[in-house]
Amino acid sequence: MKLSMPRFDQAPVLVVGDVMLDRYWHGATSRISPEAPVPVVRVEQHEDRPGGAANVALNIAALGAQALLVGVTGRDEAADSLANSLKAAGVDARFQRIDSQPTIVKLRVMSRHQQLLRVDFEEPFRTDAAALALDVEALLDQVKVLVLSDYGKGALQNHQVLIQAARARNIPVLADPKGKDFAIYRGASLITPNLSEFETIVGRCADEAELVAKGQALMSELELGALLVTRGEHGMTLLRHGQPALHLPARAREVFDVTGAGDTVISTLAAALAAGEELPSAVGLANLAAGIVVGKLGTAAISAPELRRAVQREQGSERGVLGLEQLLLAIEDARAHGEKIVFTNGCFDILHAGHVTYLEQARAQGDRLIVGVNDDASVTRLKGAGRPINSVDRRMAVLAGLGAVDWVVSFAEDTPERLLEQVRPDVLVKGGDYGVEQVVGAQIVKAYGGEVRVLGLVENSSTTAIVEKIRQKG
């Protein structure tokens, strides 16, 4: 599946549901309590993070999309903490505050990255469903997708009113369902149960074929547009009417904590759909996002750069021939990992041993080597009629096959100055017997603090000489 990064800045999403505060107490554990056989934790740090529907909205904002949130809280310190965190993250939160009930808080006691205890402070909210529906309807014209983030805590009382209001405006409705009655989500564009939630409704599935059959039946019964079953280490399965099932393998490299993974899936889906992605592509992006977030500790959001890097890995753009946009993203990823970027350029019309030795020496100047290649028209201007011998596509393909070369990109100008201004390498390398100041682009690189290095030429290695020898023998 071909994936690309959507324009999340053009993706307004409204999230409605059960907001909660995820509170973490971190501390050291070195002894057992004399009062009971339990560890004593000396609390050294505490942090609050938005949870539930608030985490969905936070994830949407972290991707660079516009997140609006409607939910229910108490009128207390936890609600204030939630509101402040969401505002700082760029989420437009509208809370229905209830004096008589506390904000839902999930307190986790942590030591050495392990969860020792979770304490829940909650009671189901007695929501003013009519007032909440009015708040939602007032915002629907501002968004492209509606998300129902349902944790069964009472914020969502009349799902059908919200679903029908969105459908009347041709706004897709995504629901993360809970409970034993999925009929309340009838008419939704997509629901995203995990496997356990799905099997609670349809019964145990012995294999994928049975999962698909039961899923298709559920879609028809509830008039759903699509169904996405998240299956942990087995990935995800997307079902659509009249289409074959789409099975996506899990993409997690390491799994530390699955807390909030479902929130990440539906938030990425919503943001991608709001940005104009087709459903299969949006699911592919959500699958990558889930693989990232389970590698983090606790309730966490992923950023657009993190997802962008995952897309690059998925599309194999860690190495090889890249367009300029892809290259700039790959450089951003490399710099995020502290890697030094080296750049060199040339025509590389007929690759020979001298080129290979030179490129290996250039690669040794840093961590990543970019080779800028003159396109065919510029080679003709520089070398004369009859050149290049090989087209730019072939020249770049050969260079990309060398172990020393990370990325290859072409440029149309006679010199690489314009490309250097965009790439901004840490080190500019050229081969020759001249001084640093004579290197084309040296002033550009040195102006922003980069280095320029000149490597010696390999003797008896010249493309021009090779071409002349071929012509003499031809």
Swiss-Prot record:
This is Bifunctional protein HldE. It comes from the Bacteria. It catalyses: D-glycero-beta-D-manno-heptose 7-phosphate + ATP = D-glycero-beta-D-manno-heptose 1,7-bisphosphate + ADP + H(+); D-glycero-beta-D-manno-heptose 1-phosphate + ATP + H(+) = ADP-D-glycero-beta-D-manno-heptose + diphosphate. SUPFAM superfamilies: Nucleotidylyl transferase, Ribokinase-like. Residues 343-474 are annotated as: Cytidylyltransferase. Residues 1-318 are annotated as: Ribokinase. One of its GO terms (molecular function) is heptose-1-phosphate adenylyltransferase activity. The gene is hldE. In the N-terminal section; belongs to the carbohydrate kinase PfkB family. ATP binds at residues 194-197. GO terms for cellular component: cytosol. Keywords: ATP-binding, Carbohydrate metabolism, Kinase, Multifunctional enzyme, Nucleotide-binding, Nucleotidyltransferase, Transferase. Pathway: Nucleotide-sugar biosynthesis; ADP-L-glycero-beta-D-manno-heptose biosynthesis; ADP-L-glycero-beta-D-manno-heptose from D-glycero-beta-D-manno-heptose 7-phosphate: step 1/4; Nucleotide-sugar biosynthesis; ADP-L-glycero-beta-D-manno-heptose biosynthesis; ADP-L-glycero-beta-D-manno-heptose from D-glycero-beta-D-manno-heptose 7-phosphate: step 3/4. InterPro entries: Bifunc_HldE (IPR023030), Carboh/pur_kinase_PfkB_CS (IPR002173), Cyt_trans-like (IPR004821), PfkB_dom (IPR011611), RfaE_dom_I (IPR011913), RfaE_dom_II (IPR011914), Ribokinase-like (IPR029056), Rossmann-like_a/b/a_fold (IPR014729). Homodimer. The active site is at 263. Pfam families: CTP_transf_like, PfkB. The keyword Kinase applies. Catalyzes the ADP transfer from ATP to D-glycero-beta-D-manno-heptose 1-phosphate, yielding ADP-D-glycero-beta-D-manno-heptose. The keyword NAD does not apply. One of its GO terms (biological process) is ADP-L-glycero-beta-D-manno-heptose biosynthetic process. The lineage of its organism: Bacteria, Pseudomonadati, Pseudomonadota, Gammaproteobacteria, Pseudomonadales. It is an enzyme of class 2 (transferase). Its EC number is 2.7.1.167, 2.7.7.70.
